[in-house]
C-alpha cells in the first residue's frame, strides 16, 4: 500500500460529471430515484419509458444543472433496444452508464399462472435487460469503460408466493449480472446489481395501508421501517461512479436488514 494511493482518493471518485446514463423506467417509482441520484452526481440522463413523462422528472433533473431527454417506447418492442441506444448516442454522444430498472410484476397462484402472465414478465424483466446490455456493451467495449447496473430484488434470493415469474426473472437477472461481469471486466466495464427491499412507493401502498400486512413486513426488517427512495440513491451513485471500479459481479442489497432475519 502506497501513501500516494491513499492520497489520490477523494470525493471526486463519486462524481459523474460529463457522463451519460440511461435509466429505463426512470420517470416513476424507484427508477425516478435512480435517475435523480445520477443527475445529482453530474450525469446527463436519458430515460426510455412506456409511460410518457408528465414534466415532473424533467423539471427535477434539469434543476441539477444537467441535461435530460426522454423516449416513449415499449422496451420489449421489436428493435427497441437498438433504437434506445442509438437515440441516446445521437443526443449525448455515448452511453457510460446503463441502469436496467424497468420491470413488471403480476400475481397469481401457481396453478393459475399461465403463459399470459409468464411471458410478459420474462420479456420486460429479463430479455429487455439482456438486449439493452448487449447493445450498450457495443458502445462501452471500444471506449474501454462502462457501468451496467441491473435492478434485482430480494426475490433474487427468495422464492415468494403468487409470483413464480417475478422470482424467476430476478434470480436470472442476478446470474446474468455475474456472467456479463465475467466477460466484460477485461474491458473496464463493471456489471453489478442493486437488490432493493421493501420501499414506500405507490406499488406497496395497499400493503402499507393494511395494518396486518404492514406489521408483517416491519417485523421482518431490523431497521423497523419501510425503505425511502433516498435510501437507494447512494447505492446507485456508488455503482455508477469510479469509486466502484473494482466492484464487479456484486449484488448490493439495500433492504434494512430484511434478508438476515
Curated annotation (Swiss-Prot):
Leading EC class: oxidoreductase
CDD domains membership: Ga5DH-like_SDR_c
Alphabetized GO MF terms: oxidoreductase activity, acting on the CH-OH group of donors, NAD or NADP as acceptor
E.C. no: 1.-.-.-
Signal peptide extent: none
Disulfide partners: none
Residues annotated for substrate binding in this entry: 153
GO biological process: DNA damage response
Membrane spanning residue stretches: none
Chain residues that bind NADP(+): 22-46
UniProt-annotated catalytic positions: 166 (proton acceptor)
Key words of the record: Oxidoreductase
A Pfam family reported for this protein in Swiss-Prot or TrEMBL: adh_short_C2
PANTHER family, A to Z: 2-DEHYDRO-3-DEOXY-D-GLUCONATE 5-DEHYDROGENASE (PTHR42760:SF5), SHORT-CHAIN DEHYDROGENASES/REDUCTASES FAMILY MEMBER (PTHR42760)
Family per record: Belongs to the short-chain dehydrogenases/reductases (SDR) family.
Protein name, entry field: Uncharacterized oxidoreductase YgcW
UniProt gene name: ygcW
